[in-house]
Every structure is written in C-alpha cells, then in structure tokens.
Regions:
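Bacterial Sec-dependent N-terminal signal peptides
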Residues: 1-13
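Non-catalytic accessory regions flanking glycosidase/transglycosidase catalytic cores in CAZymes
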Residues: 10-232
C-alpha cells in the first residue's frame, strides 16, 4: 500500500470539519451551567461572604464575586455543597446571628459559625441572579428536618416554620424549586454512608414528605460518586 500511495500523498490529506451555526438541533438546558458552593477553604467565608472586605456590600457579600457570577451566567447554584451537607442542620443557620451555634465541621475540620444560612444564601442567589438549589442532609439528618426546611422556604404563612421565616424578616416565601436528596452517600467517607437499598428507602420517604409540603418542587437523587461502579444498579 505504501508503494501505491506515496508518503507525500498521505501526508497531504486533510480532514475538513464544517460547523453550521444556523442549524439548530436542540436547546441546551440552561441548568447545565450550574455550580455548587461548598463550605471548604474560602468557598463561603472569604469567598461569597466577607464583611471585612473592601468589596463587601451592605449585607457582607462580595460585590466582585456577585458580578463575576453574573458575568459567567451561572444559572443554578447548589448549597450546601459537598460532604458538608451530611453534617449540616439547617436550623443552626437561621435567626439572630449572635445566637447561632458554632459547630465542629466534621467534613473538613475546623469550626462552622453558621453566619451563612438559608436566608443569607437566598439573599446571595437573588443578588447574583442564580436559581437556588438546596441539598438536604440524608446523612445525619431526618425526614422531619427535610420537610420542615421546605415548609420554612416555600409555605407563605400560617404554619410554624413559615411564620418563623417571617419572624426572621422574610415575609415572602423563598420558593426554592430544586432540592437535592443527599450527597455522595455511596462513599464510606460520608457521614451516614448508606447502601443503595437503604439510601433508596430514605430518599423515597423523604421525597414523599417534602412533596406533601410543596407538590411543585423538583427533586434530584444522589447517584454514585464513582467509588463503587455497581452502586447505581
């Protein structure tokens, strides 16, 4: 074959790729351009929130981070992100900041001040024009904790948790649509690590109660983090 097709001829052959920008195949889901904010390093404190920074706005959020988030056109932002989820109890992070408990962060070490909680993250999301996406604790958390969080965020008034939100200064419901059911529960490094069977049972029951509070929410289950390739089966 080399005698039939000289080296020079082979080397000169080129592939041509044509890109037709006028041909629309389908629309890309804007949520593909989402991200998550994690309580690790300076992801939260010193990152999106730093009241001592010269970039801080009146609520302590960094204006440069807000503007860059807008510039990147981040569509949806998950919180709390990562392993921190499995030890986080949302009621620690609401109400008077001076009365919020400081907890040991079992995921990453150090201490969690709870200065950024549900209402503060909603404030940041609104400023940055991103869709908030909350992830519930299915590691050390409970069914009640998950459904109460939906009540706090999405019920207008007249119940314990909706009225608690109003007492905390947020009369209108936050209307959080997207909710994740746990984080990397397949991994033994995770607080509350579960087998596929145990996770499925808890996720189904948690989803049921959450939807009884608000039927319009959208739920995202936790799949394998690639630790165990067969976990999803």
């Amino acid at each position: 074959l080399l005698f039939l097709f000289p080296h020079e001829t082979i080397a000169q052959e080129r592939a041509i790729i044509k890109i037709d920008t006028d041909r629309v195949i389908d629309q890309i889901n804007p949520h593909l351009y989402g991200n998550f904010s994690e309580h690790l390093g300076q992801g939260i404190y010193g990152g999106i929130y730093d009241p001592k920074s010269i970039q801080a706005d009146e609520d302590g959020f960094r204006k440069d981070v807000i503007e860059q988030t807008k510039e990147l056109k981040v569509s949806i932002l998950r919180w709390p992100g990562g392993n921190f989820v499995s030890g986080y109890h949302w009621e620690d992070g609401i109400g008077d900041r001076s009365k919020r408990p400081t907890r040991i962060d079992l995921a990453w070490g150090g201490k969690e001040s709870n200065m950024i909680g549900t209402d503060e993250f909603i404030q940041f999301a609104r400023k940055a024009k991103v869709e908030p996406y909350f992830c519930v604790n299915l590691g050390t958390g409970s069914l009640d904790e998950a459904r109460n969080w939906v009540e706090y965020c999405n019920v207008e008034k007249g119940t314990y948790y909706s009225d608690l939100r109003r007492k905390n200064g947020f009369e209108k419901p936050h209307k959080v649509t997207y909710w994740g059911l746990g984080n990397e529960v397949d991994g033994p490094w995770q607080m509350g690590h579960k087998s596929p069977e145990d996770y499925s049972k808890m996720a189904i029951e948690t989803a049921k109660l959450m939807r009884w509070i608000d039927k319009d929410i959208k739920l995202i289950a936790s799949g394998s983090s690639n630790y165990d390739a067969d976990w999803n089966k």
